[in-house]
Amino acid sequence: RFVVQVTGYGSRGERWIIDRYNITQSLRSDCDGESQRIDPASYPEDWDVLLTDVFHKSWPLASDPSQQMRLMAMAVDSGGEDGVTDNAYKFWRRCRRDGLGKRIYLFKGDSIRRAKLITRTFPDNTGRTGRRAQAAGDVPLWLLQTDALKDRVNNALW
């Protein structure tokens, strides 16, 4: 499944949760036309639901419901079970091909402690065998210092 949270930001740094929902059904269907359960690790095409059900969606403004708000950018967690990272990279490459590469960002928790909270990398495993994800240095991946970021969020709540 994909867990979606849409967050809006104000001009002074304030933020609001606009929507939160789970995507559990794929755009794929079985022989009876029934929607299949989503499986981001096994089916690269399942990632396309992030475009139809998140990126291209709009939400009414609280101050004027006749006005619609759309996403400026979308961050997607590329980590998880085997197959997820490779399919995330394939998804981002399709987005780049369609002109969305500068508005869709792949993230994952960093396994190395660094001073910077967020580090942009370009994974390249072309010379390494036994890797499921095909990374050729063409996909930007943002590594997050998850513990430090959680501490900041927690401190902001007080």
What are these regions (language model features)?
Residues 1-111, 139-158:
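RNase H-like, metal-dependent nuclease domains and their acidic two-metal-ion catalytic environment used
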Residues 127-133, 140-141:
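Polybasic, proline/glycine-rich intrinsically disordered low-complexity segments
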